[in-house]
Amino acid sequence: MTRLHRRPARGALLEYRTYGGWSVQRPEHGTLGRFSPDMTRVLPDGRTVALTLRLDRAAYQLYREAGASHSQALHNALLCPAFAGRYGAAARGAWELELQAPPSDRVELVAMLWPQDDRDWPRGEVNLLEGRVGTGQTMTNLHWPDIDGVPQHAPAMIDLDVSQWHRYRVEVLPGRIRWAVDGRTVRTLETHHAPIDTPVHMVVQAGVNPAIQDGWRDNFEWEQTILFRPLRAPRGGQLS
């Protein structure tokens, strides 16, 4: 492990893992597609991550030849991105990122804090933005377990065009979570469930809305890219 005592450098925030390299993993939550490591890459500017969603036509045809239905072949051939930051720290403090989604209502995405140890979930999940592009809204959310360990959450929609560049910020404070976009507070939640001591990391992932099937044709091609820049995280964390 590499321990960082000062505010993490941008390079540390760009260190990441992806999903789907060794087994089939999917975005789920009603979306289509499967994660593919090739769909996530750092651009030559050294500060922007491209997260691409793409229909692999060759894979679709191979699945069809193997006897898969159209819907199953499409589900398997839609390649999706995931960025799981390797820099983790206790959630307390400010986390910032910039993101621009493509102008396609076939794209669904989430940018969030996620617990370093999956066993801590739902504690540690804080959503900066979540939902389908093109609706004019996005969702902020906090997740936590109740006294019996049953997952609870507090979703709230905000009006926002996520296909434009925006700077997203969430502050995890004792008794309070505050969300801001472009320097303006858009939501404050007073809560006893702020995960101030839970180690978390940044995650961005995306899936394909099933409406993509509505435009299907024999020569159909499709590719969309989300651009993302991790900007700030609390100090004192480490690379996993």
Where in the sequence are the language-model features?
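Aromatic sugar-binding interfaces of carbohydrate-active proteins
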Residues: 11-24, 129, 176-227, 236
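Short tryptophan-centered beta-strand motifs in secreted/extracellular beta-sheet-rich domains
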Residues: 95-97, 164-172, 177-179
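Extracellular/lumenal carbohydrate-interaction signature centered on repeated Trp-anchored short motifs
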Residues: 76-93, 157-164, 194-195, 222
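Glycan-recognition/cleft segments
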Residues: 42, 112-143
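Short, aromatic/His-centered strand-loop micro-motif at the edge of beta-sheets
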Residues: 144-167
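Short beta-strand segments enriched in hydrophobic/aromatic residues
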Residues: 55-57, 99-101, 115, 172, ...
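Low-complexity, Ser/Thr/Pro/Gly-rich disordered linker/stalk regions
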Residues: 1-104, 233-240
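Extended, low-complexity, turn-rich repeat/linker tracts enriched in Gly/Pro/Ser/Thr and Asp/Glu
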Residues: 101-107, 117-120, 174-176
